[in-house]
Amino acid sequence: MPAPFPEDSVGLVTPQLFHFDQPLALANGRSLDSYELMVETYGELNAEKSNGILICHALSGSHHVAGYHSEDDKKPGWWEHYVGPGKPIDTNRFYVVCMNNIGGCHGSTGPQSINPATGKPWGSSFPFLRVRDWVETQVRLADRLGINQWAAVVGGSLGGMQAMRWALEHPNRLRHCVVIASAMNLTAQNIAFNETARQAIQSDPNFFNGDYLAQSTLPKRGLSVARMIGHITYLSDDGMGKKFGRELRSGSFDRGNDQLVEFQIESYLRYQGSTFSEVFDANTYILMTRALDYFDLAREYNGDAAEAFKQASCKFLVVSFTSDWRFAPERSREIVTALMRANRDVVYGEIDSVHGHDAFLVPNQLRYWELFSAYMNRVEV
């Protein structure tokens, strides 16, 4: 009987739930008395516990990076193309860890969870978070796993922000920091996109100020529109043009035809929004986008990014994509310039791609694969 999964996949994986009773002091002054983290791991931790790789997920990501949850599972983890045997993050060499961040909606403690103080879902009362709060929970997970130092901390987009925060706040606990399609802070335009998405959610009559679960409803329409807005910014004009152009899904422009015309891109966006609203939580979306907005790596260093990076002692890989206008290459070059001014070891790659911000997730990009693989092969275990 043939194997149910591709040979270069990690195959069947089972998430693990870790419970923490130690109170977590948050950056906003509030705290969580206890919390849970949903985690997946791939590969084997070596005897020295020196081959650990932490992957930090982005806005809509989760702990499910690679592999399948059942033999009938048709959709692998979100980074399946880059994590597994013989892939850039090679599970034959590395012990790979990813957790669903707190505030998430894939098993870790978040707005959908029951608040032990009330016995009801947290909803709107769940505290807003900062990137450093996620890093603190990741540190505690590393301690639980017995990993004193990661071989590398890796992340794309919001995940890259977490990786950089690791490098500054826990410099002795990672040897390499891989930052893909990210930035040291958001531009005004980026914040504007996030606020527009939040307004779409909050304008849904089923939002109920974030306490929709208490009303036994969900703001699916608002979340769907928010996802449509976000998804447009993750693509590129060239990429959308090549994939959809002005092709029609229905109707025509023939004279005398008054049927409503639907473009392929319209149908695609509605599908993306609808499917996302079935699996993601609106409060989590608001929380995650605010964490993005609030992040500023150099804020505590008087805006001097080089001074901030002087706190780091690891080596860096920074990657950008030419068509990414949400986290444009110049934002990655700002990171590289600051690292060089701080006299830190950095490799930079700018990849030609039509896939926009989502390029860091997209398979079959040879130069990206080669750069990523070459760097990770240098990571000592």
Swiss-Prot record:
Record-linked Gene3D superfamilies: 1.10.1740.110, alpha/beta hydrolase
Subcellular location: Cytoplasm
Residues in coiled coil: none
Reactions catalysed according to its record: L-homoserine + succinyl-CoA = O-succinyl-L-homoserine + CoA
Domain AB hydrolase-1, first and last residues per copy: 53-361
GO cellular component: cytoplasm
A Pfam family that the UniProt record links to this protein: Abhydrolase_1
Site keyed Important for acyl-CoA specificity: positions: R326
Protein's job: Transfers a succinyl group from succinyl-CoA to L-homoserine, forming succinyl-L-homoserine.
Family to which this protein belongs: Belongs to the AB hydrolase superfamily. MetX family.
Protein name: Homoserine O-succinyltransferase
Species in which this protein is naturally found: Saccharophagus degradans (strain 2-40 / ATCC 43961 / DSM 17024)
